[in-house]
Amino acid sequence: GIRIIAPIPGKGTIGIEVPNKNPKIVSGQSVIGSKKFQESKYDLPIVLGKTITNEVFMFDLCKMPHVLVAGATGQGKSVGLNAIITSLLYKKHPAELKFVLVDPKKVEFSIYSVIENHFLAKLPDGGEPIITDVTKVVQTLNSVCVEMDTRYDLLKMAHVRNIKEY
């Protein structure tokens, strides 16, 4: 059925959602290979797909201080996270980017284990490159916080506000 959002929060408009009876699959290759993504000047470009007008939809992760991904089972959370990771892998060199991946299901991010030596950061005590043991998540996040504080101290000493100014 049709869903009406009236009014759209923060805007003086009404939204009408009409289900697409003929949905089209948008391949990752088509958006990653698009001119818009390839020539993007964003610091951390993320491409998620295409808009209803068939334009490549992308944004700069640097402009988003926080991201919350939530939804019911089967609604595309993992697809969205994989699109974010893939976008960054295509645009950044391993010297510029490291991921800390937590995967309690043990199957969502296992495909990224092959990039362990290049893009995955892990705790000094070793272990798997993708954290699947929920008892190690707090220790891992604490280590990330220590690294974050160290970097903030470096920014402070350099009298800059962000890594781009550094």
Give residue ranges: language-model regions.
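Surface-exposed substrate-engagement region within the catalytic domains
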Residues: 20
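P-loop NTPase catalytic phosphate-binding loop
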Residues: 5-17, 25, 30, 35-161
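Divalent-cation
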Residues: 2
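Short, intrinsically disordered, charge-balanced linker/junction segments flanking boundaries
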Residues: 163-166
